[in-house]
Amino acid sequence: MVGNEKFVASSEMSIHSNAIILNEKYKGIEDVYQAYGRGSFKIDLGCGYVKPPGFIGIDNLSGEASQIPNVQNAPDILMNLDEAAFPFPDNSCEEVRSSHFLEHSQLMHILNESYRVLRPGGTFLFAVPYANSAEGMYPGHVQFLTEKWFYENLTFQKNFKIEHEEYFPSADYLKLPFFLRMLIPFKFARTFLFNACWQMIIRCSVKK
């Protein structure tokens, strides 16, 4: 259902796989399109309360952002991101981004839906904790990701082209004496040593 229900505590929400609940400032999904621009909008998946300006913020019905209704910068849409289709037409979206969300998700569903809604040449940008790190091992994660997964998954490679990668050294790695960091370059350390890299950001273009 696509409705104009107000945000309410998650215990009162239907978590039917197709349920979509809009922020109370919208009467229907058309209002979301009007607010952000049909055919040129951007989506932030798993946005919580920190979605960037200009992005349609979407979060899970069971996520943290569904617990407190109508706070400032609340998501525009709550839905079951792991099962339901995104409420947007094919080839309609300029950019899909997520920050520390994919590791909590049913990854292939998210990737397939992101590919579907992105228009040709659209951008898919994501940040995830590096699997081989303390952040990557947090309880609640269901995906444990490094760049290796994205380079070796055939479906991802078919649908997306990796344009840029950035890796963030952990505080522990940066505390190593300079000569050790020269002996153990970061690229080697992030692959073979635990907790050398804590996060990666990858920017892709969609292949259509």
Label every model-predicted segment:
Residues 22-29, 42, 143-147, 197:
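A structural signal for well-ordered alpha-helical scaffolds and beta->alpha junctions
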Residues 20-23, 33-38, 74, 104, ...:
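A short linear-motif detector with a strong N-terminal bias
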Residues 36, 40-132, 204:
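Conserved SAM-binding loop
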Residues 34-35, 48, 192-195:
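A general structural signal for short secondary-structure junctions and capping/turn motifs
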Residues 11-15, 115, 206:
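Compositionally biased regions
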Residues 1, 50, 155:
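Residue-level marker of positions within ordered structural domains that often coincide
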Residues 106-113, 123-208:
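S-adenosyl-L-methionine-dependent methyltransferase catalytic module, highlighting the catalytic core
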Residues 2-35:
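Class I SAM-dependent methyltransferase Rossmann-like catalytic core
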